[in-house]
Design a protein with these regions (language model features):
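Active-site beta->alpha loop and helix N-cap motifs at the rims of alpha/beta catalytic domains
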Residues: 1-32, 37-44, 55
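Alpha/beta catalytic cores of nucleotide-metabolism and tRNA/nucleoside-modifying enzymes
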Residues: 19-22, 27-29, 43-61, 73, ...
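Ser/Thr-centric signal marking residues that sit
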Residues: 33, 68, 112
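A cross-domain feature marking catalytic cores of carbohydrate-active enzymes
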Residues: 34-38, 66, 95-97, 121
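Glycine-rich tight-turn/loop motif centered on a GG-T
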Residues: 1-16, 67-79, 141
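General secondary-structure edge motif
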Residues: 4, 34, 65-66, 159, ...
Length: 210
């Protein structure tokens, strides 16, 4: 994307962002949304300017990842910037970045006053995060963590889906990354699993663990 001057590279060219968004909004009759970062680099933070351009172009909702492109996923998330964008815009603003627990979600919503949350890496290996967040927002208390039995049931469905979609050769290979998210607290087990090439061997290995 960056080599083609697309994606977050566009943050360096606000006029081009304006032209693209205006053209897209005019070309379709469905609501158009946008996701941005806070800028190209810490020295080139222009997320607020881009957000205003987006709203003026007719964007109906804006998701903001609270880091610059140069920061990647490292460093602290700029929740202050997300809050400033939310304060300035009239359209819904969705906060994104380091939402890993229900408590994170509650605190980020309160701090930024965002209209919603966009969750990515925090849900990898933890699809229960959404239910946990909903419960915490509704009741103010943490939801009990899923049992190993429930985790195994969901993981089996995940694996069977991968095998069905990608086949018996590529399926197990792709499964290594996905299972790694579930086993991120168990690096030794993850390493053992990564040597397994057969679907049945993978399932048997995980069945013994869970």
């Amino acid at each position: 994307m960056l080599k083609k001057a697309a994606g977050s590279a566009l943050l360096r060219d606000p006029q081009l962002v304006k032209d693209i968004l205006t053209a897209v909004v005019a070309a379709v009759d469905v609501p158009v949304t946008l996701k941005i970062r806070t800028g190209w680099s810490p020295e080139q933070r222009n997320g607020l300017d881009i957000a205003n351009i987006a709203q003026d172009a007719g964007i109906k909702a804006l998701a903001v990842h609270g880091r610059t492109r140069a920061c990647g996923f490292k460093g602290a998330v700029e929740y202050d910037t997300i809050a400033a964008i939310k304060h300035t815009l009239d359209i819904p603003v969705i906060a994104n970045g380091d939402i890993n627990t229900a408590e994170d979600a509650t605190n980020i919503l309160a701090y930024t006053n965002a209209d919603g949350l966009m969750i990515g890496r925090g849900a990898q290996g933890n699809p229960w995060l959404f239910q946990q967040i909903h419960h915490h927002l509704e009741h103010g208390t943490p939801l009990k963590k899923p049992s190993n039995q429930i985790i195994w049931q969901v993981l089996q469905q995940h694996l069977y889906g991968l095998y069905d979609l990608y086949g018996e050769i590529m399926g197990p290979r792709i499964a290594r990354k996905h299972v790694g998210w579930y086993l991120k607290q168990e690096p030794a087990l993850r390493q053992q699993f990564n040597h397994l090439k057969d679907p049945l061997h993978q399932l048997d290995f995980l069945n013994h663990y869970f």
